[in-house]
């Protein structure tokens, strides 16, 4: 990707990272390397368990396999560069590299968000309209939902990337972050960021809040339906099926709202923690959360491990 913004005198950015202390760098490298390997391994096991187990060939697990794939790509867009910078004295990223990382950060993060909304809709249909579940969640419809979830977010990401590329960056090139995120990069621009801020404060929240409301509506309807079930075992099964989805949604959206539902000018170092949660920790924890109380997935993982041993 060649640098397009010829009006900038900045050809690279410096990422300050999580700590400026040299003695912390190797510790952080080992910590995030372990997290990255656990993320890749855990999500890959979920994908393989679903792929090779006939009992898991359902819409719910179809969506889960794509969520795991997206989580692998999402984490890979962030962590490898972090690991390189932990061991490097010059913690730099090229202008083109910064735009590329930001593009995939937004595209894959929004794909995650879309897939969580689709999975909530799937559970809503399964619990609230079970007689039409096979028709509504047919394989054709599932493929279309996944295709939309993985393609539409790229338009959102492309919009922010192109608007950012129009800006001029003069002398300051130090990003107070461990990755190229929109708000800290906008702070470095020596040209007007009015349009960027308007888009970020209107389009981005609308996209995020709309998906979150879809998820909230789905689970409110599920809750009201489950409470009407006379059988205690039926209630327990429905709650256990949806409980881990709510855990993932809370973890993912809670951290995202902390970062992005605020003006770019108010972005602070404290937001690093929330960014780590939704870019790194969420992707690592998802496989454990999904398999913790899911007997079918546990059985699928056991079968997969027994085949490999």
Curated annotation (Swiss-Prot):
Q: Which CDD domains match?
A: 7tmA_OR1A-like (cd15235)
Q: Which residues lie on this side of the membrane: Extracellular?
A: 1-26, 81-101, 160-197, 261-272
What membrane topology is given? Multi-pass membrane protein
Q: Which residues lie on this side of the membrane: Cytoplasmic?
A: 51-58, 122-140, 221-237, 293-309
Any idea which GO molecular function terms this record carries? Answer: G protein-coupled receptor activity; olfactory receptor activity
Record keywords: Cell membrane, Disulfide bond, G-protein coupled receptor, Glycoprotein, Membrane, Olfaction, Receptor, Sensory transduction, Transducer, Transmembrane, Transmembrane helix
Q: Give the matching Gene3D superfamilies.
A: Rhodopsin 7-helix transmembrane proteins
Q: Which named protein is this?
A: Olfactory receptor 1L8
């Amino acid at each position: 990707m060649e640098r397009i913004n010829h009006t900038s005198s900045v050809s690279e950015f410096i990422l300050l990272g999580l700590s400026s202390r040299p003695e912390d760098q190797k510790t952080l490298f080992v910590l995030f390397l372990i997290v990255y390997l656990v993320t890749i391994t855990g999500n890959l096991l979920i994908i393989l368990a679903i792929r090779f187990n006939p009992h898991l060939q359902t819409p719910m697990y179809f969506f889960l396999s794509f969520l795991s794939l997206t989580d692998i790509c999402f984490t890979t867009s962030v962590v490898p560069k972090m690991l390189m910078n932990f061991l490097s004295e010059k913690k730099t990223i090229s202008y083109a590299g910064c735009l590329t990382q930001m593009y995939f950060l937004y595209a894959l993060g929004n794909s995650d968000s879309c897939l969580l909304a689709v999975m909530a809709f799937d559970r809503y249909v399964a619990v609230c309209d079970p007689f039409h579940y096979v028709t509504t969640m047919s394989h054709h419809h599932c493929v279309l939902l996944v295709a939309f979830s993985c393609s539409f977010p790229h338009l959102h990401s492309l919009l922010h990337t192109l608007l950012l590329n129009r800006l001029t960056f003069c002398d300051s090139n130090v990003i107070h972050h461990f990755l190229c995120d929109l708000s800290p990069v906008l702070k470095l621009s020596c040209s007007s960021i009015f349009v960027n801020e308007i888009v970020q404060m209107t389009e981005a929240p609308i996209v995020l809040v709309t998906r979150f409301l879809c998820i909230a509506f789905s689970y409110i309807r599920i809750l009201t339906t489950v409470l009407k079930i006379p059988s205690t075992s039926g209630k327990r099964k429905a709650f256990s099926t949806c409980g881990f989805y709510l855990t993932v949604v809370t973890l993912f959206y809670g951290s995202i709202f902390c970062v992005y539902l605020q003006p770019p000018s108010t972005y602070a170092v404290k937001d690093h923690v929330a960014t780590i949660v939704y870019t790194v920790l969420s992707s690592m924890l998802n496989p454990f959360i999904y398999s913790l109380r899911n007997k079918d997935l546990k059985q699928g993982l056991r079968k997969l491990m027994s085949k490999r041993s």
